[in-house]
Amino acid sequence: MAVLDILTIPDERLKRKAQPVKDIEAIQGFIDDLIETMYHTDDGIGLASTQVGSTDAVIVIDLSETRDQPLVLVNPEIVEKSGEYVGEEGCLSIPGYRAKVTRFEKVKVTALDRQGKAIEIETDDFLAIVLQHEIDHLHGKVFIEHLSTLKQQIALKKVRKYA
């Protein structure tokens, strides 16, 4: 396994849209690297493939206290959403910056697990927020795009100062 470099704004590769994975077996090593990279961070609870420069549609999430229960989702899609929730978010691609973001309170996501089995997740807790955040990355969006232009500029300045 390898720890991959996490891209930070304003890297244009973060704006690329992920493509559906057709051969899950071929990306097993990459999935391991993505998990290892997430665990290598101090406080990362999720990571999308596009954050490390890949266009394979894969996200990994681990909300466990022990950070040893990774959830791997290949080709995830939000198929239902409802409600509204405002909460503070941060991002490994925007180090040193947090802001309040409006998200859907409840989501239903379909995906494949790392063995290629179809799964469905319906949630209205913190996982719903993390799923939306990571799936946004697969669509070429970072969380600050949900904010005003002024707040986006502040985030960019903080990242440049942090670097």
Curated annotation (Swiss-Prot):
Gene3D superfamilies reported for this sequence: Peptide deformylase (3.90.45.10)
BP GO annotations: co-translational protein modification; translation
Transmembrane segments: none
InterPro entries: Peptide_deformylase, Peptide_deformylase_sf
Active site: 134
Reactions mediated catalytically: N-terminal N-formyl-L-methionyl-[peptide] + H2O = N-terminal L-methionyl-[peptide] + formate
MF (Gene Ontology): metal ion binding; peptide deformylase activity
Cofactor note: Binds 1 Fe(2+) ion.
Source domain of life: Bacteria
Cofactor needs: Fe(2+)
EC number(s) given by UniProt: 3.5.1.88
Keywords, sorted A to Z: Hydrolase, Iron, Metal-binding, Protein biosynthesis
Pfam families attached to this UniProt entry: Pep_deformylase
Sequence positions that bind Fe cation: 91, 133, 137
Family: Belongs to the polypeptide deformylase family.
Function description: Removes the formyl group from the N-terminal Met of newly synthesized proteins. Requires at least a dipeptide for an efficient rate of reaction. N-terminal L-methionine is a prerequisite for activity but the enzyme has broad specificity at other positions.
Protein name (Swiss-Prot/TrEMBL): Peptide deformylase 3
Organism: Shewanella oneidensis (strain ATCC 700550 / JCM 31522 / CIP 106686 / LMG 19005 / NCIMB 14063 / MR-1)
Species classification: Bacteria, Pseudomonadati, Pseudomonadota, Gammaproteobacteria, Alteromonadales
